[in-house]
């Protein structure tokens, strides 16, 4: 395990809490040991972990299962991954983890300690979407995990393409209120092949029976704004102005996305 001074130095440089860097570091070891499960990483964590080293930090790990896997097998593989991560990294991962199955998939809570003392533990929330509950439209990538820390970690994982990640982020605008989705689309739009994003969006919306309702989205502006700072301030040093991000995201959808 890397020394606590390295974690604290990284936190100062990134302008985020120590707990954010600890979680980022621990997530990498879990990713390495979860690669035995046939699933693909997606969402904001996928952006930081394999595409852009200095992208915003992410709290959770989100995956889509690529085959039917029973709950008991997932529990077994997660226990193996937690124990393997603990042995290889020296991080104090708890052998006990939370596990819940729902209609969409599985929710797992993994706990660990690095600099904390006493009973306090940091949680990593992991969501697995069941096979068939999401439609992957573009070829998956096999990418190396970016590990900007002083110990030795080498791992390759399956991950969504950036275009598919952005398409799901846009769809998410119309499903729930998550400021990180606004930030990601705002930041990534000029860095992906938007032609491909626009080609797959209709199928993405149709699969989840989501409507492209701009009027409803603009009505929820205040909800996004109220959650903006608390949702993102611990994930990056400089948070852009909410009005700039929201206005630009809505304008891009209005002007460039039609179906």
Q: Residue ranges of each PLM-predicted region?
A:
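Active-site glycine-centered loops adjacent to acidic/histidine catalytic or metal-binding residues
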Residues: 44
